[in-house]
């Protein structure tokens, strides 16, 4: 199908670099994104054992400034943003008033009365409208900087080792969720010790016009380019939810294992989140047959839920899945997943499926 101007896919600042590297491109959240380069398993293994880099420039960035910035963020999120200090980051949610999520997000404290919020690519417009609606009266200025920044995620146990010779900051002194300015290959960037793979790593915020040069330099020092395919298998092994799968406008987020996000404070949507979750998110492992989103989950022959994400785990060597099941069925051990009309045994297992050594 030919893309019309109205449906044309957006491109990140690294689009040409992906094509040069032979990436297979696919539509994702309205963007033309690399799903793989050399191959999913090789890219996955590189991140688990060494270092890989992802283009996540499709993510959105909003700057929140003003004397009311903290009060505003406390109002729109359930985690306690007052715990942040300049140079620190925090995982958080944007709840709606119906017991679901507008999005799951990261908040970075830049300085006094100034924060950066990173949101999922497919939710940029929705999140922006939601925040604009709730901002009235808080004395804050919201700026959508999504087109200003490119975002690269250098992930893996050797991420710090490969970056250290090329930055002017001691990376060893930076703890998880640190956020700090640096010079990388001579370019001004902000680095965050955050990621979505279950490994150590750094996310690089850089001016969109300079991103391709930095990407090429990362290629030159041997960092493996990795696509959305490996990003998904890595995050699933680590038990990380993906918006649109484990979280959504109509999925109670406290069905997940992320109950720690909600703190005892007032926030928009709190009353709806206080209603008990009717489902629970569980981990499943299977012997041979990979399962996909939407496949029915059965217990004693009865449908009790569905798969939200599934893959064949490159690290573990067998299929794994996250599934939403009825709360009353969640404590059982033995389930089945229906694949093309046939039920395959599945065993509930702890999440995360994989933890970095």
Swiss-Prot record:
One GO process term, biological-process aspect: glycine decarboxylation via glycine cleavage system
Cross-referenced InterPro entries: GCS_T (IPR006223), GCS_T_bac (IPR022903), GCST_C (IPR013977), GCV_T_N (IPR006222), GcvT/YgfZ/DmdA (IPR028896), GcvT/YgfZ_C (IPR029043), TrmE/GcvT_dom1 (IPR027266)
Enzymatic reactions: N(6)-[(R)-S(8)-aminomethyldihydrolipoyl]-L-lysyl-[protein] + (6S)-5,6,7,8-tetrahydrofolate = N(6)-[(R)-dihydrolipoyl]-L-lysyl-[protein] + (6R)-5,10-methylene-5,6,7,8-tetrahydrofolate + NH4(+)
GO molecular function, one term: aminomethyltransferase activity
Pfam families, per database record: GCV_T, GCV_T_C
Entry annotated with the keyword Plastid: no
Residues in the signal sequence: none
GO cellular component: cytosol; glycine cleavage complex
Family: Belongs to the GcvT family.
Complex and partners: The glycine cleavage system is composed of four proteins: P, T, L and H.
The protein's name: Aminomethyltransferase
Species the sequence originates in: Deinococcus deserti (strain DSM 17065 / CIP 109153 / LMG 22923 / VCD115)
UniProt lineage: Bacteria, Thermotogati, Deinococcota, Deinococci, Deinococcales
């Amino acid at each position: 199908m030919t893309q019309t101007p109205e449906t044309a896919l957006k491109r990140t600042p690294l689009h040409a670099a992906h094509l040069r590297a032979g990436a297979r491109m696919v539509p994702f959240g309205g963007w033309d994104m690399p799903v793989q380069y050399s191959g999913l398993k090789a890219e996955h293994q590189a991140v688990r054992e060494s270092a890989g880099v992802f283009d996540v420039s499709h993510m959105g960035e909003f700057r929140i400034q003003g004397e009311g910035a903290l009060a505003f963020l406390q109002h729109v999120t359930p985690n306690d943003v007052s715990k942040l200090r300049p140079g620190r980051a925090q995982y958080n949610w944007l709840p709606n008033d119906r017991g679901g999520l507008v999005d799951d997000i990261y908040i970075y404290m830049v300085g006094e009365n100034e924060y950066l919020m990173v949101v999922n690519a497919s939710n940029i417009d929705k999140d922006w409208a939601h925040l604009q609606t709730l901002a009235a009266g808080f004395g804050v200025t919201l700026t959508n900087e999504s087109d200003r920044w490119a975002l690269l995620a250098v992930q893996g146990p050797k991420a710090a080792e490969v970056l250290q010779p090329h930055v002017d900051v001691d990376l060893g002194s930076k703890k998880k969720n640190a956020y700090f300015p640096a010079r990388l290959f001579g370019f001004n960037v902000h680095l965050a010790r955050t990621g979505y793979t279950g490994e150590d790593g750094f996310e690089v915020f850089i001016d969109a016009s300079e991103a391709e040069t930095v990407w090429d330099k990362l290629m030159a020092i041997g960092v493996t380019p990795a696509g959305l395919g490996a990003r998904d298998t890595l995050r699933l092994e680590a038990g990380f939810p993906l918006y649109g799968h484990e979280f959504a406008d109509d999925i109670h987020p406290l069905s997940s294992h992320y109950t720690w996000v909600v703190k005892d404070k007032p926030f928009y949507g709190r009353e709806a989140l206080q209603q008990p979750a009717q489902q629970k998110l569980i981990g499943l492992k299977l012997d041979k047959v990979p399962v996909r989103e939407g496949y029915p989950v059965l217990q004693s022959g009865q449908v009790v839920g569905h798969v939200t994400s599934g893959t064949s785990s490159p690290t573990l060597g067998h299929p794994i899945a996250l599934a939403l099941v009825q709360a009353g069925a969640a404590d059982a051990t033995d389930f089945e997943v229906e694949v093309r009309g046939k039920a395959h045994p599945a065993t509930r297992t702890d999440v995360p499926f994989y933890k970095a050594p």
